[in-house]
Amino acid sequence: MNHFKGKQFKKDVIIVAVGYYLRYNLSYREVQELLYDRGINVCHTTIYRWVQEYSKVLYYLWKKKNRQSFYSWKMDETYIKIKGRWHYLYRAIDADGLTLDIWLRKKRDTQAAYAFLKRLHKQFGEPKAIVTDKAPSLGSAFRKLQSVGLYPKTEHRTVKYLNNLIEQDHRPIKRRNKFYQSLRTASSTIKGMETLRAVSYTHLR
């Protein structure tokens, strides 16, 4: 499928613009200025539309290619500010530090954690272990899932220091708090950021 068909600008321009925005802590206007300095005149609103569209495409293609993770997962939630209000980002990574999935929600509770863990099970099956912090909602959600037959052989570990890796990975996402304008656009942007990070990590291994 040609994801660039019918676009006014060439594929290379779109890829560079989206890459600048997702990889660096830049605003859409700052990306516009960088492109203008290179002789490319494109409006910041067009760059915004590209980021929203191609972040989702990148994320979909990455997840389609990477669907197996059997050993262990690390999972937690963190705070993301969107238009002055706090939201909660659930995120899971595999044993190699690659993102399995993310989910941005308005509430942080057992129901949200339950739905995210169920979604992970549907996509990736059952790992040997899931490492989380000691948030009550995560433990409660895991026990509820086991009571209905999911994760029967998975060990749930709540050792705080095993989760330091995923906590550190939240920093680039949080640095962009001032740019998030809605739950939908923040979710798309974060998916794009996570995908580029995963691709870069894979190439460096």
Predicted features and spans:
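Mobile genetic element proteins and their domesticated derivatives, centered on retroelements
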Residues: A17, V31, I47, D76, ...
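Conserved small/polar residues in nucleotide/adenosyl-binding loops
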Residues: T202-R205
